[in-house]
Amino acid sequence: MNHRTLFATLFLSLLLSLSAAAEETKSTYVRFKTNKGDFVIELYDETPLHKANFLSRVREGAYDGTTFHRVIRNFMAQAGGGLKGGRDPKGTYIDSLSRATVEAEILYPKLFHKRGAVAAARVGNDINPERRSDGLQFYIVMGQFYLEGELKQFESEERPMPEEVKKAYMTEGGTPHLDGEYTVFGQIVSGMRTIEKICATETDETDKPRKEIYIKSAKVVSRP
């Protein structure tokens, strides 16, 4: 191989590497279209396992036609556990995805449950002490505002609450009791009004919306 060929090969390899890196940067946003409106999630690089899993699910269309099956006012909206039209998800592909868990990436206090946070659902500690995440279901935090004194109940000597986290819960709101228990892997960067509408919907005794809220599509986008 002569010098020109070697240089061309190295240059091409560099371009491909830069292109791959740029594509990965573009892949940090996901736009969801629902029958209540749209919203965009930014995925965190700090939780690479969850980011890769979420992008994979989005690209294969796993969320299309699924519902927000659990909604609690002033708390959160959970998606990915139901199918549009009231179909039973048991035995379906999305059911198998939920059972394929992801290793926990809990990074409190860097990533915490402030308003608009996106986190992975999971089963309880009694059968899941490793706090592994559901492979499909996620929830979006609505939460509520807290006074500084109220936040003391969520602190301990082993897990103090940094001032910037306290400030976020006092000025933006959130669900501090979930910190350290679930993996936060993203944040709503556009369309929080849609989440507000979803969380304000009327639900039954099982927290299921009385009027179906479903995801029309989820697509990876390069910007919010």
At which residue positions do the language-model features occur?
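Bacterial N-terminal signal peptides that target proteins for export
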Residues: 1-8
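Bacterial N-terminal signal peptides
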Residues: 8-17
